[in-house]
From Swiss-Prot:
Homodimer. It comes from the Eukaryota. GTP binds at A449, V450, G451, K452, S453, S454, N552, K553, V554, D555, A585, L586. Residues 216-237, 308-328 are annotated as: Disordered. GO terms for molecular function: calcium ion binding; GTP binding; GTPase activity. It comes from Caenorhabditis briggsae. The gene is rsef-1. Ca(2+) binds at D46, D48, S50, K52, E57. Pfam families: EF-hand_7 (PF13499), Ras (PF00071). It is found in: Cytoplasm, Perinuclear region. One of its GO terms (biological process) is vesicle-mediated transport. Keywords: Calcium, Coiled coil, Cytoplasm, GTP-binding, Metal-binding, Nucleotide-binding, Repeat. Belongs to the small GTPase superfamily. Rab family. Binds GTP and GDP. Plays a role in uterine seam cell development. This is Ras and EF-hand domain-containing protein homolog.
Length: 634
């Protein structure tokens, strides 16, 4: 018997898939075997005496039993002419096949089974086996395997089991037939009862239907009367409604005509509003142009006045310089004559001095000569006097002449001294001392009521003005200051902070050189809009302009809870890449510092632009004629 067949047999016995068999499993599989037979089979298969049959023990024991049977001459399955009994008598099988060995089992044909097959065992002629069971194929395979195993005792036990199982099936079949007969009789009785009930229900339904029809006729008649009355009322009401609708239609026609007229007026008003907006925008641009023209005109007027003052001053300086140059020329002529005479005297005295040179040298080494001391002292005093004289003379008057080598040192010292005096004035933000060299347009921006106008008043008038009116549109102011020794004109454009003037502010940003963005340290909402303002400035300008972020009203920080901290403002300025300063228009703290920082940034940016464009400011060409050149020629 092949191992797969034995494994299948073990799987059939091990219904719970435990991997081993117990005595209870054998009793379930073979309930017709007595305890002695079961114990004998269990002991034969349980080789190690563990009380359970392992799978390997079952396979080995069953295989050894089959081999033992084959060694006794029972190899293969011999199918004999068995007799099958049915109700009509003995019936012989039609197909009789003999298989000599187990190896031919894979190629043997299928067994043809007719209506019912009854196998008659040689060992027990008194038992008829009927294999017409639900699992007929499995039983036949198992029966063939038992026949081929060569264990007659086990085959007899299997035949008893199959016979008892067939007997139980027959009893169950008879019981099922009896129950079917009972069910058929009950069903017939139930059908008769249902027919009687249906007839009764039909009669009752007919009565109820007749009654319902009568009631429905009465109800419909009543409803028809009521509907007729209601229809008459509705007809009269509808006539009234029609008349009212006709009147309303006339009113609506008049109203529609009025609305059409209003629509035409609204369209015309919309066109007029658009034209008004265009005119307002043009007016704003004209105001901007006018303000710029005014600023330029004021700047030109200031430059003109300054030039006139400078021209008159230079005329006075020129006349004074001419007089000074004449006196200096005369003094130099006298000096040259004296120098010539000294040279002649020096030649005549050199011979006399040669004879006494050794004696005079020894005398000079021992004691200094009072004449030399006086000459040295006089030379120092003369140098200081000459230096003061050259400092008093304007440098441009002297520089117009070509100095000779003897006076070049004095001129260099004078230039260096005057340069030192000028360098000492190159610090801070001071009032202008002359015409403006440069002009910068600076736009004041920020939310409403943050102190922009007060900031401008502090810059222009050096005072705090309380209760200033709100700025409408833009206010224009000009302040000329001296920054690091340079006169600079600052045009301050004070814009309105309301949202409705935001588009007007953008037009000023396009022409601005710099911007001062002001927020109120006591109003956090104005600080939160700083980023939007900076983005608006950057979007409106064609190039990057210097911006300073100013936190105003720091004098009120201590009295205001939740004020914006200085570190927050500095962080915002660093993140946006702008300057930062906290100020107070009330006490004027850091106002000048903020303007100084922004002005220096504007000047630095303009210097870079001038260098990048290749513009070089050369000094004026020097005059080729002068008193020194004439003196040298003479």
């Amino acid at each position: 018997m092949a191992n797969p067949d034995v494994e299948n047999l073990f799987s059939l016995c091990d219904s719970e898939s435990k991997g081993f068999l117990t005595m209870e499993d054998l009793k379930k599989v073979c309930p017709q075997l007595d305890d002695n037979d079961l114990r004998f089979i269990f002991n034969e298969l349980d080789r190690d005496g563990s009380g359970k049959i392992e799978k390997m023990e079952f396979l080995q024991g069953f295989q050894e039993t089959v081999q033992h049977g084959e060694s006794r001459g029972l190899n293969g399955m011999q199918r004999r002419a068995s007799v099958a009994f049915d109700d009509g008598g003995p019936v012989f099988r039609r197909d009789e096949l003999v298989f000599e060995s187990e190896s031919d089992s894979s190629s043997r044909p299928a067994i043809r089974v007719y209506d019912e097959e009854h196998y008659h065992s040689e060992s027990d002629t008194n038992i008829n086996i009927d294999f017409s069971v639900p699992c007929q194929e499995e039983v036949l395979v198992l029966y063939e395997q038992l026949q081929s195993s060569g264990v007659p005792a086990l085959l007899r036990k299997f035949e008893r089991v199959v016979g008892s199982f067939h007997k139980e099936l027959s009893e169950k079949k008879h019981e099922n037939e009896r129950l079917q007969r009972i069910y058929a009789s009950e069903r017939e009785m139930y059908n008769r009862r249902m027919e009687e009930m249906e007839s009764e229900v039909d009669q009752q339904l007919e009565l109820i239907e007749m009654k319902a029809r009568q009631e429905e006729r009465e109800r419909l008649t009543k409803e028809k009367e009521e509907m007729r009355e209601r229809m008459s009322e509705e007809m009269s009401e509808m006539r009234t409604n029609i008349e009212r609708l006709q009147r309303m239609e006339k009113v609506l026609e008049r109203e529609n005509e009025r609305l059409n007229h209003q629509k035409d007026l609204s369209d015309k008003l919309k066109v007029v509003n658009e034209e008004n907006n265009d005119l307002r925008q043009n007016l704003a641009e004209n105001h901007l142009e006018l303000a710029m023209i005014k600023s330029e005109l004021a700047q030109v007027r200031a430059d003109f006045d300054q030039k006139q003052d400078e021209l008159s001053a230079r005329r006075d300086q020129a006349s004074h310089a001419t007089e000074e140059s004449e006196s200096v020329r005369k003094q130099l002529q006298l000096l040259f004559d004296a120098n010539r005479k000294l040279h002649e005297t020096n030649e005549s005295l050199r011979d006399a001095l040669d004879s006494r040179a050794s004696v005079l040298r020894q005398f000079n080494l021992r004691t200094p000569s009072p004449g030399l001391i006086n000459s040295n002292r006089n030379s120092v005093e003369n140098f200081q006097t000459s230096t003061n004289m050259f400092k008093s003379v304007p440098l441009h008057a002297i520089s117009d002449e070509e100095p000779d080598p003897e006076t070049s040192l004095i001129l260099d010292d004078a230039h260096s001294l005057q340069g030192m005096d000028i360098a000492e004035g190159l610090v801070g933000l001071n009032d202008a001392n002359g015409p403006a060299e440069r002009t910068f347009r600076i736009v004041m921006c920020g939310d409403a009521a943050v102190g922009k106008s007060s900031f401008v008043m502090r810059v222009i008038r050096r005072q705090f003005t309380n209760q200033l009116p709100s700025t409408l549109g833009v206010d224009f102011h000009v302040k000329t200051v001296n920054v690091d020794g340079r006169n600079v004109a600052l045009q301050l454009w004070d814009t309105a902070g309301q949202e409705r003037f935001r588009s007007l502010c953008k037009s000023y940003f396009r022409r601005a050189d710099g911007a001062i963005l002001v927020y109120d340290v006591c109003a956090e909402h104005s600080f939160l809009r700083v980023r939007d303002w900076i983005e608006t400035i950057k979007e409106s300008t064609e190039r990057s302009i210097p911006i300073i972020l100013v936190g105003n009203k720091v004098d009120m920080r201590l009295q205001t809870p939740g004020a914006v901290a200085k570190t927050d403002g500095a962080s915002m300025a660093a993140a946006m890449g702008v300057l930062f300063m906290e100020t107070s228009a009330l006490d004027g703290s850091n106002i000048d510092n903020a303007m100084l920082a922004l002005t220096r940034e504007l000047m630095a940016v303009e210097d870079v632009e001038i260098r990048s464009t290749g513009v070089v400011l050369n000094p004026a060409a020097t005059k080729k004629g002068g008193c020194f050149s004439k003196c040298r020629g003479s």
